[in-house]
Amino acid sequence: MFLPLLARLGFQQHVANAGYPGSQMIPPVSALLSLLALKLLDKERKSHIDDFNFDKALGLFAGLNVLPKKSFTTDYSYRTTRDHQCGLLRGWVKALATLLFPQATTVSLDFHPIPFRGDPSALENHYLPRRGKAGPSVLTFFALEQESRCLCYANANITRAEQHGELMRFALFWHALTDKYPEWLYFDSKVVDYSELNRVNELGTFFVTIRRRGAAIVRRLATMPSSSWIKAVIDTPKRRHQQIRYRDEEVRLRDYDQLVRQVAVTGLGRDTPTLFLTNNKTETAREIVIRYAGRNRVEDSLGSSVNFFHLDCLASEVRLNVDLDATMTVLANGCYRWLGAQLRGYEDMSPKKLYRRFVETSGAVDIQPDRILVRFDRRSHNPVLREAALDQDPVPIPWLGNLPVKFTFV
């Protein structure tokens, strides 16, 4: 089902340009497609590739007779570098943008620590939200294009000392793809320190973030007269807290060279005001709050990555190994966001539900002289796939002898 997309995006060429290694029996594109197949099929670990030892259809997906054994997939992760991942992400995101987010202006950023359950001696401690405390983990960083909700960047090769520079590394990555920096960036208080906000300013990029609530700040706001707070309504559908009060002012931050706009908001379900910081002076306070609320999309996407793409099933304590897994998560997320965009009425459906309703199905594959014919068995959602015409304008599949794929439905 995803072969037409991968061929249209030039996946094989992106793999070649990135310089991924291969073996005498398994070329680089087949190795990566084997790893990607596990993400697309809700498999938790590389060792679970042995579930498909005799599945010829999945072997065909990767351009092989059958998928490689778990020893190969495990070993392959240790042969890649960060440069390989960056090269593949550059090609993938640039090609996918033409289909899903051609006019991208807004990106949400977030860190995600993947907990490690073995010997912690080689790993740094990071705060783990699910445990409510710090623990040994591998820190990963993701970026999400706001409108399409498509992951567009990942890095798992980060140390604590390098953490605050990751935003600028992403900005340079984005500029290399689009010849411009993002117009808006949304991120929480842990992504960068205040000195890094100066560099964001220099890019000409607007940011919205939140400020940590110090006791002195909370006390000062508590002394402000009620007449200095303005009422507003955040009428987002299904939003729980819609009636808010805010105070809009400019403040100074340590290590930040200019005055910054601070919007203090009450009524969001917390005992103390939430402090929004932005360098934009034209948007209303209400619009700033709504913009930052949209950052939940990157958290939702990371939740799906944990739930369906099994991001938290740590591939290794070696960061470079985890980096390849994070890159495969970005690719799998893009595949499912594309699939949802093609299915009318299912644009917002999660990858897990898309998989259950449309991908997890049986059928037959017939390799003909001029094409590869895929017959889907009868299912209630087949009319939706038929209407989407995923195989329209057939594209030759380079790793399948340049044969196009045709879908038929019982």
Model segments located where?
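Basic, amphipathic alpha-helical segments enriched in Lys/Arg and hydrophobic/aromatic residues
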Residues: D312-R371
